[in-house]
Amino acid sequence: DEGGTQYTPRL
């Protein structure tokens, strides 16, 4: 992903 901030936020 794009750092996990655009499509699926990595929390």
UniProtKB/Swiss-Prot annotation:
Belongs to the pyrokinin family. Mediates visceral muscle contractile activity (myotropic activity). It is found in: Secreted. This is Pyrokinin-1. The modification Leucine amide is found at residue 11. GO terms for biological process: neuropeptide signaling pathway. GO terms for cellular component: extracellular region. It comes from the Eukaryota. Keywords: Amidation, Neuropeptide, Secreted.
